[in-house]
Amino acid sequence: MSHNTFGHLFRVTTWGESHGAALGCVVDGCPPGIRFTRDEIQAELDKRRPGQSRFVTQRREPDEVKVLSGFVLDEDGETMITTGTPVSMLIENVDQRSKDYGEIARQYRPGHADYTYDVKYGIRDYRGGGRSSARETAARVAAGALARKVVPGMVVRGALVSMGEKSIDRANWNWNFIGDAENPFFTPDPASVPVFTQYLDGIRKAGSSVGAVIEIVADGVPPGLGAPIYAKLDQDIASGLMSINAVKGVEIGNGFEAARITGEQNADEMRIGNDGKPVFLSNNAGGILGGISTGQAIVARFAVKPTSSILTPRKSIDKDGNDVEVMTKGRHDPCVGIRAVPIGEAMVACAIADHYLRHRGQTGKGIGSRE
């Protein structure tokens, strides 16, 4: 299997499977002199970690990261400083239950990659989906934690804005509420917590699942990142988000809503601000024009389908060509969109970090220069 690497200068390779001994990533191209701590990497992984509420898989993985290479320790004994060589990180799997998957070793689960992996490779790891499992994304989150350090002043945040037929009230948006102990959904709307709780409890008790829409916002991104035609910043952000398990759609800025309004409504007008710098009067473009960042917040949303692993019996076939009925066992998320929030943040951070380095290398100018 090829294509386990993404990025051009900030290159991330992930490895490992759902029920293997471990998984991890190698980040090649991280500039020297980036200061970070293991705790900063761990904090991002903890946001994605399973088993933290009844609304996510009960697989108990501590996801403790080990940083193996690419750094020297500062005098404080905790701060790591990148040397410019590959940064390798490892996360052990400790709570696999491969026996839960014995019955589907030769059966194809509807909605999963079982059939397509078998068609392409002639072999598949049926234990939790192997490489196609969202377990792999823990490695991306680790890489994304490092990517956040590459672009000075950049802040990448994500939020769950809808779950199934339930949506947040954007008038209540509060970034500080995300991460609150009373908020298991990454919602920025405190009023949505009881709504999501009742809704997802009903879905979960019925043995079913539901999808979600996630919004990622990157502030502090300098203007000038990206390139026309085949190296657009929004193109690479969309590609990264589409690579996440269960993602079926991506939009930047107004996205599909832009097709429903007029040019007067959609085009972001400009003025010169009091400081002599350009100011946009709106951000329908999501911070990107012509594939190049404007300096505004970059806004992307992605749609996550309902988890295919449900308790309801489903019609399928097996490897021998027989009609079968499949009922999934094991531990699964009733809404995989919840834990997709930190994954989406990581993919956006990696894409922007990559374009930051590409811009710096290509133009020879300071970031955002208008010379």
UniProtKB/Swiss-Prot annotation:
Q: Name one GO molecular function term.
A: FMN binding
List UniProt keywords, sorted A-Z.
Amino-acid biosynthesis, Aromatic amino acid biosynthesis, FAD, Flavoprotein, FMN, Lyase, NADP
What pathway or pathways are given for this protein in its record?
Metabolic intermediate biosynthesis; chorismate biosynthesis; chorismate from D-erythrose 4-phosphate and phosphoenolpyruvate: step 7/7
Q: What's the Enzyme Commission number for this chain?
A: 4.2.3.5
UniProt binding sites for FMN: R131, S132, S133, N245, A246, G290, K305, P306, T307, S308, S309, R331
Name what cofactor the protein needs: FMNH2
Q: Where does the chain bind NADP(+)?
A: R48, R54
Decide whether keyword NADP is in the record: yes
Q: What HAMAP family does this protein map onto?
A: Chorismate_synth
Q: What is this protein's name?
A: Chorismate synthase
Q: Which organism is it from?
A: Mesorhizobium japonicum (strain LMG 29417 / CECT 9101 / MAFF 303099) (Mesorhizobium loti (strain MAFF 303099))
